[in-house]
A protein has these predicted regions:
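N-terminal FAD-binding dinucleotide-binding subdomain shared by FAD-dependent oxidases/monooxygenases
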Residues: 1-233
Length: 233
């Protein structure tokens, strides 16, 4: 059951074994691993930003937000056309109608298209109307029988730490202070809540670029430095 299709970026070697030659370089060439990590950082953090840059005078705002965004759209649309050239019925359902980078782009090595084209898989885009004793009924009236239903309905992105109740100095409630607008310094610390450090906190979510692993490491470095300052002073 699909509410909104995703854009897919072709990554042929995704989850593949690291080649022996590169493994040798990691082991024997000084600082090669550090250089490669820096290259990955640049490639995944800085390079994609141009793709999301909005050109105010761009004439095709119904499909993209600028020339680089349009280029990426053509690249990914071509990938989908190639993957589903034998299934035009699916191609119509998987092409998004919004600009790339408006939602997270999925990295794909061909597994997702191959899964959708299996004989025992059916992609339903008709909105869900209700859950029934036998499965799911869509808005068009069709009932789809199911033994197991997995709810992938999204996230309450601004309700951090829910359902926990967190109280700070003077008994102030964290969610009442935020009042639906979660904010934190560097996404980590919050006024009136001493000794509270957040990981993956407000406004640190990534959509266009970056690695949550790297961002988490930066947050841990900041938190450890803060704890050291507290202990030493």
């Amino acid at each position: 059951f699909q509410r909104t299709p995703n854009w897919y970026m072709p990554v042929p070697n995704y989850h593949e074994r690291v080649p022996d030659g590169m493994r040798w370089l990691f082991t024997h060439v000084p600082h090669y691993a550090q250089w490669y990590r820096f290259w990955l950082f640049w490639y995944s953090c800085d390079a994609p930003l141009e793709m999301a840059r909005v050109d105010p005078g761009w004439p095709h705002k119904d499909r993209s937000v600028g020339p680089m965004n349009e280029w990426v759209r053509e690249l990914m649309a071509g990938y989908l056309h190639d993957q589903f050239k034998d299934r035009p019925d699916l191609l119509e359902k998987v092409i998004p109608n919004y600009p790339p980078a408006a939602k997270r782009i999925v990295l794909d090595n061909g597994i997702w298209p191959a899964t959708l084209k299996r004989d025992n898989v059916r992609l339903v885009t008709d909105p869900i109307a209700e859950i029934t004793p036998r499965g799911i009924r869509t808005r068009g009236g069709e009932e789809h029988q199911a033994d197991v239903i997995i709810f992938g309905t999204g996230f309450q992105a601004s309700r951090f730490l829910t359902p926990m109740k967190v109280r700070g100095r003077g008994g102030v409630d964290l969610h009442e202070q935020w009042d639906g607008d979660a904010r934190a310094y560097m996404g980590i610390t919050v006024p009136n809540f001493p000794n509270l450090f957040l990981m993956y906190g407000p406004n640190t979510n990534i959509v266009v670029n970056g690695s949550i692993v790297y961002f988490s490491e930066c947050e841990v470095t900041y938190i450890m430095a803060s704890l050291r300052l507290l202990l030493e002073n």
